[in-house]
Amino acid sequence: ERRCMINIQIFLYTYHTRIDEIFSSFCTSIYNLEGKCSMISKNVFKTLGMIMFTGASSVAFSSANVSKLSTVWDKTFSKSDKVSYEKVAYSNRYGIKIVADLYTPKNMDKSNKYPAIVVGPPYGGVKEQGAGIYAQTMAERGFVALAFDPSYNGESGGEPRHVSSPDIFVEDFSAAVDFLGLQSYVDREKIGVIGICGSGGFALTATQANQRIKAVATLSMYDISRQKRMGLYDSLSDKDRKNYLEQISKQRWEDAENGTPKLTPQFPNQPLEKIPDGLDPITSEFFEYYTTKRGFHPRSIGAFTISSEMDFINFPLMNYLDTISPRPILFVVGENAHSRYFSEDAYKKAAEPKELYVVKGARHIDLYDRVDLIPFDKLEKFFNENLK
C-alpha cells in the first residue's frame, strides 16, 4: 500500500481515462496486486484524480500572458519597509526571457559594492512564494537578493509553457549570476545561491561548474532527477520505470500530432478552504502549502509537460558534488521532512567544507515560508563568512 501511494503521482502523469478503470489496471498490471490495494488507497487515488488534479490538460498560459508583467504586489507574504523592490528581466544563454524580483537594502548606497544572493523557488513554485520570502529577508540583512521564475514558468518566457528541463533550470541560476554581476553595486566575487526544494538540486549542479558562485545553501532539497527515475524512497522498479517511459515516449507522438504538449495534472486554479480528506501525508502537506491561502498563487500550477519527465530520468543532477570544494555547502533540512534523505545523501557525496543543519520540528514545506522555523540567522552567518 505504501508503494502504491508513493507512485500514484507518477501513475497519474501517464494515464488519463476513467478513474475506476485506471485504478484496476494500475493495481493489476503495474503492481500485480490483483485488486488488493486497500479501499483507503483507492479513495486517496480518486481524490487525487478528481480534486488535486483537474486532469491532464493542454498548456495553460500563452506568451501573451507572459509579456504582461504585473506591477502590483501579488506575493504570498507582506512587503517589507526595510527593502527596495523592483521587477527585472534578462535573458539566459538560450535567449529565454527570465523575469525576477530584485530586493535590495533600503537606502542602499549604490556607489558601494554589496554581496548578492540568487534564490530559486521550489519545484513548481514561483518567485512570489517562498523564494521571495528568502530574497526579501536576506535583503533586510544587507544582501542584494534576486528571486526568479524558472524558464517556461511563472512570468518568465519560453514556449511551450511549463516545460521542465534539468539543463535549462540549472542554466537559470547561471543567468541570474550573469545579471547580478552586471549591476554596478554588486561585488562579483561575493555571489552565492540559495535553492529551495527542487531548486536545491539545480543550484548545486550549477555550482559544480560555475566558479562565479562562491557559496551555496539548500533548504528542503529535492533531487528531482532521482525522484523521477527512482520514485520517492527509491521505490520504483526497473519494470515500472520501463512502463512509465513507454507511456512518456508515446505521449511525444500525441504532442507532435496535436501541436501542443499535454501537461501533468495540476493543482486547482482557486485556493481551497480546506485540505481534502483522505490524502496521504505527503500529498496533504503539499496541498497545505500550494492549494490554500498559505501559499496559493495562480501562476504556481504544480504541473509540467509530461514529456519533460523523460529528461530528468535520462540526465541525473549533482553527479560531481565533490568538485564544489573548496567552496562551502550548507544543507538545511527539516527534522520531519519526508525529503530529508535527499540532503543527507548529497551531504555524504559532497567534500568539505560542508554542513548539514537540521531544523527541529520542521517538515518539508515548513522551510518554504515558516519564518519562525527558517534559520535566517544561520543563513546570514554562512554567507557573511563565505562571501568575503
Question: Residue ranges of each PLM-predicted region?
Answer:
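Alpha/beta-hydrolase active-site loop
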Residues: 163-184
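Conserved alpha/beta-hydrolase
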Residues: 137-155
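Short beta-strand/loop motif that positions the catalytic acidic residue
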Residues: 331-333
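The serine-hydrolase catalytic nucleophile loop
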Residues: 124-136, 150
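N-terminal cap/lid segment of alpha/beta-hydrolase-fold proteins
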Residues: 69-112
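Short beta-strand element of the alpha/beta-hydrolase
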Residues: 112-122
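Catalytic histidine-centered segment of alpha/beta-hydrolase-like enzymes
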Residues: 362-373
